[in-house]
């Protein structure tokens, strides 16, 4: 019978969101899970063509990582990727935090949470710093969590919920509600970036912004990133974004001063030099200064 035999066609994916996700630095675990979800969706389609029953698996996720590790960026791209593959109907993302889910009075949270799930139908509900819902130990947060757990089951075929936040706090968050933990299918870790990865992220940002740097400048940027990694809460990808933004401003100031009433070549406008980059946003250790007189 024709429906007993289905040809599997493995086409090279060319969808922009998927390629953009694959191009991101690091995140091997995230990319692997994305491919598994897409493969499962394709398999369910083929089973349906064969007349077999379909299985709608839960795809709720937990993103655990420090600030600047691309959790929100990945969630936004993932919503588009899953829309392209018809896993999600609309592929939009509803982003919210504690202030968006907790009401002023008992009973309000349930209505607010329900409205968020309604808004996210056919897409992703992204809850950032979800642990803040239970940190204050007040009734409102607990009410919101209990409603979220209930709606995760009610909307499991229409909404993918992604919880995101700091690793340790997310672990404590799950321990406070067993029903919540059991409904999360994927626990994805977003590790801090290494100096090499931060420099690669800078390369991608430069390419996207139509700037470039020479090898000497790249070596300096690697050194800056290595110093940043030794600091606590340095910001990961956000640090690189700020580093580049400051470099672009310094380059602009330099070129305007150098070319007053003159002409500027396109190559110069695209080139960032080593002098344009400097450590920003982190406290430097104070250098000891010698005070006194030298013997003659």
Predicted regions, residues:
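C-terminal engagement/docking regions of AAA+ P-loop ATPases
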Residues: 4, 11-15, 252-296
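Pre-Walker A (pre-P-loop) alpha-helix and adjacent loop at the N terminus of AAA/AAA+ ATPase modules
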Residues: 16-59, 80, 296
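Short helix/loop segment immediately N-terminal to the Walker
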Residues: 43-58, 214-217, 255-264
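Walker A/P-loop
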Residues: 53-91, 115-118, 184
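Conserved C-terminal "switch" segment of AAA+ ATPases
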Residues: 85-90, 172-175, 181, 190-234, ...
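Short glycine-rich substrate-engagement loop in P-loop NTPases that contacts/grips substrate
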Residues: 90-120, 142
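Conserved P-loop NTPase "ATPase switch" module shared by AAA+ and STAND
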Residues: 97, 120-139
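Conserved catalytic/switch belt of AAA+ P-loop NTPases
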Residues: 131-162, 166-181
């Amino acid at each position: 019978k024709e429906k007993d035999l289905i040809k599997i066609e493995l086409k090279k994916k060319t969808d922009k969101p998927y390629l953009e996700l694959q191009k991101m630095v690091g995140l091997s675990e995230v990319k692997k899970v994305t491919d598994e979800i897409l493969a499962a969706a394709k398999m369910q389609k083929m089973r349906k063509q064969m007349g077999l029953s379909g299985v709608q698996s839960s795809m709720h996720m937990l993103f655990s990582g420090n600030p600047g590790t691309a959790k929100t960026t990945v969630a936004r791209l993932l919503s588009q990727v899953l829309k392209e593959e018809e896993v999600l109907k609309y592929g939009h993302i509803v982003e919210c935090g504690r202030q968006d889910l907790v009401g002023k009075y008992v009973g309000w949270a349930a209505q607010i949470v329900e409205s968020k799930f309604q808004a996210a139908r056919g897409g992703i509900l992204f809850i950032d710093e979800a642990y803040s819902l239970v940190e204050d130990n007040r009734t409102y947060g607990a009410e919101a969590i209990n409603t979220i757990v209930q709606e995760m089951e009610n909307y499991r075929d229409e909404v993918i919920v992604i919880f995101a936040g700091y690793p340790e706090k997310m672990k404590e968050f799950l321990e406070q509600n067993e029903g919540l933990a059991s409904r999360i299918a994927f626990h994805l870790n977003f590790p801090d970036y290494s100096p090499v990865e931060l420099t690669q992220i800078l390369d991608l940002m430069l390419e996207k912004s139509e700037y470039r740097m020479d090898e000497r400048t790249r070596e300096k940027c690697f050194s800056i990133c290595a110093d940043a990694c030794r600091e606590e809460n340095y910001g990961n990808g956000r640090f690189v974004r700020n580093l580049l933004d400051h470099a672009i401003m310094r380059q602009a100031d330099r070129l305007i001063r150098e070319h007053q009433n003159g002409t500027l070549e396109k190559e110069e406008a695209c080139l960032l030099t080593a002098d344009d980059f400097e450590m920003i946003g982190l406290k430097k250790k104070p250098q000891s200064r010698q005070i006194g007189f030298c013997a003659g």
